[in-house]
């Protein structure tokens, strides 16, 4: 933003938020005047130009990657990511139209493009920075709705509502930034090589409140409420899951007789509810919203760290001359605000595996893996297999691929993950009628996890007298280095009648493993 509040840095103005004094660029025997250009320090100009040029280039490339990541990946086209794209567009516009001229001003020490372009440039500066702040404000409201109303979020925040919110962001930003172009400013200096800031007191108050302090208050209130709601909801959902597990209403592995399965299914239809409780569904959806809130909380936190020093130094230096910081400190403060434009493209891939994969695919490093994931998403199920665990097997965990199953960006359908194949041992197939098995894999399961059926009643401590089923979750058979039976093993995919979510049922008997 253009520091329209600055009344203390006014001697020879670069058009950005801090004023640069001409005597900083003149020799010891030279004086600044309207007719004399400052002497250029070539060494300093080259070093400053290289540093600022690299910074601007990084901001441009990073924000382009953010925009392309959402545009080229259908599963990233969510309302929350629309706000992220809007933030990237504002930062990209700032990097293209404002930062190069700010860097030129730093290198040369005076404005070279005339009075009219100075006014336009300053207005675009305010426009882009205000749009960034208001986008973060919209993101904080979106995250509060996502955490507070996680199940109703898709109906409360639709694509149409998100687009209307983005249009409102740019309209408000235009209203705040256009004032000086319409004459709401003090008289311009006589020297066109000075690009001063607007010191008109009422516009200074209006722009500072609308561009930073009011949106900042909304952001802080929303994220405080997100923290309170997340803490309370997590506690309640975890308590509900523990209660249902203790009542044996929610089992991740159920082995039962065919008659019992049919009776349970018929009673479930009669009662009109699903034995798989909605508590797990709520917990899974809420965990996704909370994870997104954490990532965007980092974005907001870095924004505050970058811009707050400037908005503290600017009004204090304007109102109280004794509190005015040195020119070198003031330059660092306002360029720290500009530095925020290249931070977000670093935060997203570090905090989100989905954005990291999208960045890598755009850069051409994982195109083949991207095709595999897209094909699996079209099939609607993850190709994970299980095998019986036999006597003498060591209780080890194996990670068959680097991507953990808790990533919501791939191989996810609804609220459960499915295990589409079974591989019984040859010796077990000839045993005759065996109970069917029904498997429901939840996102918390990891490749290599060991799943065991509790001991049958009345046989506690007698592991050799009853069929103790133990299974090991293997990795994706399509992934390199993964082993597993990829045949369907007589399994069929069914649908959860209550929730409309894909489930999995297998009538293929599995081999018991004895320790």
Swiss-Prot record:
Transmembrane residue ranges: 46-70, 84-105, 116-141, 162-182, 202-224, 296-319, 327-351
UniProt topology in membrane: Multi-pass membrane protein
PANTHER family according to UniProt: ADRENERGIC RECEPTOR-RELATED G-PROTEIN COUPLED RECEPTOR, ALPHA-1B ADRENERGIC RECEPTOR
GO annotation, biological process: adenylate cyclase-activating adrenergic receptor signaling pathway; adult heart development; behavioral response to cocaine; blood vessel remodeling; cell growth involved in cardiac muscle cell development; cell-cell signaling; glucose homeostasis; glycogen catabolic process
Keywords, ordered alphabetically: Cell membrane, Cytoplasm, Disulfide bond, G-protein coupled receptor, Glycoprotein, Lipoprotein, Membrane, Nucleus, Palmitate, Phosphoprotein, Receptor, Transducer, Transmembrane, Transmembrane helix
Compositional bias ranges of the Polar residues kind: 410-424, 484-498
Sequence similarity: Belongs to the G-protein coupled receptor 1 family. Adrenergic receptor subfamily. ADRA1B sub-subfamily.
Extracellular compartment spans: 1-45, 106-115, 183-201, 320-326
Protein name in UniProt: Alpha-1B adrenergic receptor
């Amino acid at each position: 933003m253009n520091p329209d509040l600055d009344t203390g840095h006014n001697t020879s103005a670069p058009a950005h938020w801090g004023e640069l004094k001409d005597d900083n660029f003149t020799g010891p025997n030279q004086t600044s005047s309207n007719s004399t250009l400052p002497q250029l320090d070539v060494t300093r100009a080259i070093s400053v130009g290289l540093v600022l040029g690299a910074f601007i280039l990084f901001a441009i490339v990073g924000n382009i990657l953010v925009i392309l990541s959402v545009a080229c990946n259908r599963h990233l086209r969510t309302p929350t990511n629309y706000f992220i794209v809007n933030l990237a567009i504002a930062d990209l516009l700032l990097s293209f139209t404002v930062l190069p001229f700010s860097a030129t001003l730093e290198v040369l020490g005076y404005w070279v493009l005339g009075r009219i372009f100075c006014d336009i440039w300053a207005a675009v500066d305010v426009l882009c920075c205000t749009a960034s702040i208001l986008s973060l404000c919209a993101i904080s409201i979106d995250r509060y709705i996502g955490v507070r109303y996680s199940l109703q979020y898709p109906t409360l925040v639709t694509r149409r509502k998100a687009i209307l919110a983005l249009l409102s962001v740019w309209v408000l930003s235009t209203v705040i930034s256009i004032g000086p172009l319409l004459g709401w400013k003090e008289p311009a200096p006589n020297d066109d090589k000075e690009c001063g800031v607007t010191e008109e007191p009422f516009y200074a108050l209006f722009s500072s409140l609308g561009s930073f302090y009011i949106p900042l208050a909304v952001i802080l209130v929303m994220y405080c409420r997100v923290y309170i709601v997340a803490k309370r909801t997590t506690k309640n959902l975890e308590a509900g899951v523990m209660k249902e597990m203790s009542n044996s209403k929610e089992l991740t592995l159920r082995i039962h007789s065919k008659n019992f399965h049919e009776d349970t299914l018929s009673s479930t239809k009669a009662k009109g509810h699903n034995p798989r409780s909605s508590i797990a569904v709520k917990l899974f959806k809420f965990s996704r919203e909370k994870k997104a809130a954490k990532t965007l909380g980092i974005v907001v936190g870095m924004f505050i760290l970058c811009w707050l020093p400037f908005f503290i130094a600017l009004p204090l230096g304007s109102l109280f001359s004794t509190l005015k910081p040195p020119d070198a400190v003031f330059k660092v403060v306002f360029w720290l605000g500009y530095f925020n434009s290249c931070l977000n493209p670093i935060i997203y891939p570090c905090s989100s595996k989905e954005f990291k994969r999208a960045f890598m695919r755009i850069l051409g490093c994982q195109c083949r893996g991207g095709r595999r994931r897209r094909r699996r998403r079209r099939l609607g199920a993850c190709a994970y297999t299980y095998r019986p665990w036999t006597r003498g097997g060591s209780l080890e965990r194996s990670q068959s691929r680097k991507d953990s199953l808790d990533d919501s960006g791939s191989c996810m359908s609804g609220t459960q993950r499915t295990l589409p194949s079974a591989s019984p041992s040859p010796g077990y197939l000839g045993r005759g009628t065996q109970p069917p098995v029904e498997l429901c894999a939840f996102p918390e399961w990891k490749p290599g996890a060991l799943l065991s059926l509790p001991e049958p009643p009345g046989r506690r401590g007698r592991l050799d007298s009853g069929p103790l089923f133990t299974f090991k979750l293997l990795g994706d058979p399509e992934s390199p280095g993964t082993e597993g039976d990829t045949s369907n093993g007589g399994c069929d995919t069914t649908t959860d009648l209550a929730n409309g979510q894909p489930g999995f049922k297998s009538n293929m008997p599995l081999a018991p493993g004895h320790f």
